[in-house]
Structure formats: C-alpha cells, structure tokens
Amino acid sequence: MTDTLSGTVDRITYFNQENGYTVLQLAPDQAMVPGLSKGGLATVVGSLPEVAPGEHLALEGRWTTHSKYGTQFAVEVCKPSVPVTPDGLKRYLGSGLIEGIGPQFAERIADHFGEDTLQVLEDQPERLTEIPGIGPKRSRGIQRAWEEQRGVKEIMLFLHEHGISTNLAVKIYKTYGEEALTMVRGNPYQLERDIYGVGFKTADRIARDLGLPTDHPSRIEAGIIYALEEDLGEGHTYSPPGSLLDRAVELLDCSPALIEEGLARLIKEDRIRVDRVPLPGDTPDGEVSPEQIDAVYLTPFYHAETGAASLLRELAGALPSRLSDIPPAFLEELHPPGEDAVALSDDQKAAAHTALTHPVSVLTGGPGTGKTTCLRYLISILEGSSKRIALASPTGRAAKHLSTATGQPASTVHRLLGYSPQEGFQHDREDPLEIDILIVDEASMLDLPLTYNLLKALAPGTHLLLVGDVDQLPSVGPGNVLGDVIASGAAPVTRLQSIFRQAAGSEIITNAHRINRGEMPVFPVRDPGAERQPDFYLFPAEDAAAAADWIVDLVTRRIPEQFGLDPREDIQVLAPMYRGPAGVDALNDRLQAALNPARKGFPEKALFGNTYRPGDKVMQLENDYTKEVFNGDIGTLREIEETGQILTVEFDGRLVKYEWSEADTLTLAYAVSVHKAQGAEFPAVVLPAVTQHYIMLRRNLLYTAVTRAQRLCVLAGNRRAVAIAVNNHQEAQRCSALDWRLKSS
C-alpha cells in the first residue's frame, strides 16, 4: 500500500546532481506524522527533481525505518509546486536554486512585488530591474534560470503523472535534457528505443494518456519493432511473416492492413529488411527445406547474418594462411616433449592437425573428453613456431577459466576487440587484430552480433578455432552460431567422444554423457565408510514445494556440513524457470532469508523488486562495458551507501559502484536460471527436477545444468521429471538462416 505525505521543504540535507538522490527535511501539512524531529520535521529520501527550501511537495511512497537514521519517508512519486506564501517565496527564491538570486535579493523581490511575484517572474521578468541592484543583464540571467528550473519541474511532474517512477524519470531527463517534455509528448515510443527500463507497454500507456490514436503510425511501427525484438529475445534472428503479423495484430489490437502499411514504412526507412530464406528446420533427410518464406529482420541483424556468412567463407578459403609455414615436424609430433607430456588420442591429434592446417575449424565434445588437453598441446606447437596467439571467451567467467586451464592469458571477446560504449569496437576490417590464430572457447555462447564483429576483426589468413560443447544450450542472444557453422559444413569439425580415465571416475561426467545420449543418469547411494564418495545425488521430492524445502536445507546445512563447501561462495542453485515454489524468484527469497536475513542495525534497500543487504550474492543482468561487468557475472554486495545512494559490488576482487537508479541491472543470485549459468562452473550445483517445470524439461537444459558442476551435483525432485527431460530432445527451433547462407556460397 502506498503512503502519502505533503508539506513544505525546510532544508536540503543532501542532493546528488547526477542521479537526483535527495535527503531533505519537510514540514508536513498533516498531523500525526511518524518519526518527526524535535523541530516537527519529517526526513524524506529518494530520487527527486532539484527542489528548494520553501517549495511545497506532494509525495507518494512508503514509510521505512533505517537502522541508523530512524523513520524516513522513501519517495516513489514527487509532485512539487512553487510556494505561494510570502515567507515561502523568500526562502524558495533565496535558496540558490535560481541563479542570480540570493537571500537578500529574494527578500527584496518578494517584498516589492508581494502576491504578484510569481506573475512577474513568469510574464514580466523585465520588471525585475525595478529592484535596486538588478540591472538588465542580471534580469535576463534570472529569467533564463527561472525558465530552466520551471522546465525541469514540468518534465518531472509530467512523467510522474503518467506513472513513471522518479528513478526512471531521472534517467529520461538525463538522456534528453530540456527537450525531454517535447520529445515524450511528440513520440513517447522513442523512449522504448533510448531508455533502458522503458518497454513498449510503458510507452504505449503514456501515448494513450496523451490521447494518441491507436492507429497512429508511430504506435504501429513501435509495436512491430517490439514484436521483432521479442523474437530476438527468444534467440531468433528473424521473424516468419505469418507469426509476426499475428502477434502484432494481437498486441496492437488493429487490422492486418495497418500492420502491412507499417511494415512498408519500416522497410522504406531501412529499419527492417525482408529476405527470402528456407523454411526453418531441416527436412527428414537433413537437407535444407526447399520451401521458402519472407523472413523479416531488424536491419542490423540482417547485416550481421549476411555479413557473418560472407566473412566466415572468406576466412575459411584464405590459403596459404599465417600458419602454413609451420614445419611438418611439429605437425607430426603434436605434443611437446617433457615429463608431463601425455600422448594425444587420435581424435585429439586430428583436431590439432585440423586447427593448424585449416583457417577455420571447430572442436566440440562433452566434459572429460580432453578439449583442454588438446588446446594445451596446440598452444605449445604454436608457441614453438613463434606464432601470435589470442585466446578469448564470450564471458569474463569463461575467459578466466580458459586462462587457468591453459596457463595462457585469455580475455572476453569484447575486451579483445577493444570495445567501448562510446566508440564501439576498435578492431574491425580497417584495424584487424595482429594475430595468427584466435581460439574462442565456450563458442556455443557466441550470439550472431558478437560473431559478426569478431569476424570483422580477423584479417584473411588468420586462423579461427571455435571450441565448445554444441550439445549445451545455445547462446542467450540471437542466433545459433556454433550449431549453424557445424551444420553448414563450412568448416571441418572434430568431435571428441572418448571419456579419459581421470574423468571416468566422476558420476557428474559419466551421467552428463548418459543424459546427452538419452539415457537415465545413475544415482549412487552414499556410503559413509567408503574411501571415495559419489559426486552426483538425487534427493526425492514429489512436487515443487518439497523440492524447494530440500534445496534450502541442502544449501544451508547438508552440503556445507558434509562437504565443507561455503553456501554462498561454492554452491550455486540453478533452476529451469523463474516462477513457482522451486523457481528462481522464490528460491532467491528463501535462500536470502536463510543465508543473509534482515538484522537490526544493518542496512538494507528495496530496489526494483529486490531487497538488498550487504553480503548478498548478486548477478549482473546486462553487459556494462563502462563498469566492465557482463551479463551473468556473479558478485557479492559489499556496501549500501545511503547518503550517496550507491551500491558497491565485488566481482572477482574488484569493487564496482552502482547508483540506485542503475540497480535494475542487478538481481539476487542465490539461484539463477540455467541459461544465465552458461560458461560458468561452480564447485557444487543444486537444481530442482520436478514435473511442474514440464515446459522446460529438455535434455540440453538438464545436460547444461549438470555440466556446470565441478565437484558435486545434487538434484531435488523425482525420477519421473528427470526421465521427461532426458527423453525430450525437442530443442526449441531458432529462426536463423546462417547455416543456409554458409551452405549456399
């Protein structure tokens, strides 16, 4: 329930110019207001437009109790109004908010003009020269400052009246400045394109409030773009025309003819492209479907798909290459001398030989099949030939793992390409990477746009080796790059299948391969007296609620006690869905309450649907290249700074600061989705396996979850749900034409 409070600003205790966070003392209009100071003032905190003493505020929000500062009113909506009393006017004008007016001039102006003061400032500012000491120049400066402050307040008030939170209103004003009101009134759908956190539905609500017709061209076009972006969010690079039309009609509640007209306008503006591609999905014999459709692309993704296909074909055909001069003796040895040298298997030798002799190649295989060993030997050969090597992965976690496994420096693809938010990618066709070979690990996580930018940075003659497990989930972003490259035959592929002896003793690895073959995993029974304990378990639970109870007990008590693992640092809960008792959201709430409960005297802050406390496990939800944190990075919340409205999060030993208005890019991470865990490994993984998650019970999802575990994997659920997942090999079909474009060269 929302609380209300109104009153006159007595003084400003703190104001952050960047994000609008304010701490002020308010003289309330109401009686019986909680937590008043001895002077009868209430403490108000939150993101506000710049306000001044004497100003009247109508506030909506919640009363909260701070461990250090006591009772406070946390603002969600603020509606300021200029004071009308003589004393209020003097304090307001003399607060410093209006440049050129200090306390003395404020008193003179209010005394001279009396009740007409506001009218003079609004309509007759030239009359300010009637005040001794105010000449024409100062009068014009005061007029400009007054109009600027009035504009800011109009913008904030307008946004609040249309349901925009103060945090989001601050973002909008910081983006557009004084043009914010004009822009929002003229085309509220522009907000969806420019402001993170404003979606089509929010923009549409504002447009309806403004009286914009439901058949307005801007609305139709924004709805079509939104429908295309929804498909991108599901991994598709394009939308089939029929499904796009149906969803747009349903979303916009309009006739198909209006959608067709909107599509034509978007094509003319080059915001979308239409291209003939085969019907998604292969024929029963594995060939490309002869039937074609008009695929609708957002223009950047059309360029990414066609460009990636063209560049990959060019790279694959560039011979002789920068590795063509490696002596044949190195190719015959295929492993370095030394005490620790282990002979490669025939498949590993084939993979290394292929990587050295083909400009583009793929190495794939499940856990324990020797991909890392193969890479170490390959790198040794390259170093012995004085070749320039670069190693990269799509995420920071995967890059760190690659560096540890190979003993070589590795970076994210974005860092390798010199990405910055302001200038984009430094390395491209005009400034390619000065390397002889690039090895990309966890290549199943490469989405289409990143692949396109990566290929642009590789000069012909450079070798590219894509390494990954094609049987895992595809990338979170649009496309199915690794799968499409393999399916196209555009590059030779080596699949490692033999499990090496040291890996064969792990139930995690052997069960992962069973799952991938469509076989039920084996659940061993723990024998306390045995020398070696199993690393794979099932705790029986018939429904999601019982599974959630097991998970909380496993994470907080059983696993720490029996395996000596830290519940926050070492154990990661993965779930296939967000909703339900055993979904990500509910598990986060329960695990936070168990591992990091609210404590008297310790700070906490509710932001964007989560309550945060120091010590919380949190995850970054989108790439932020300025902060150098990336989608899926997991860290620990170290500090909540009330005065500056700052959250400090530690990622891999590095402290990163977030303004509270940026906290929508964070979430709790005691439990995360399986998709978000791609590219990461954890000492222990705990996951629910219940039939309530039926829609998400798929083989590749279970396989991906199990292969995230290094030392321990525990399922809470039932064999029936596991069997459903193991037997469900129906992967969600992604609309992508990359494999066809590669085949049709």
How should each PLM-predicted stretch be described?
Residues 1-325, 335:
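Accessory, non-ATPase domains that flank or precede helicase/AAA+ motor cores in DNA-metabolism machines
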Residues 413-460, 672-675, 703:
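Conserved RecA-like ASCE ATPase "motif II neighborhood" in helicase/translocase motors
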Residues 97, 130, 365, 393, ...:
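The Walker A (P-loop) glycine that initiates the GxxxxGKT/S ATP-binding motif of P-loop NTPases
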Residues 517, 633-745:
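C-terminal accessory regions
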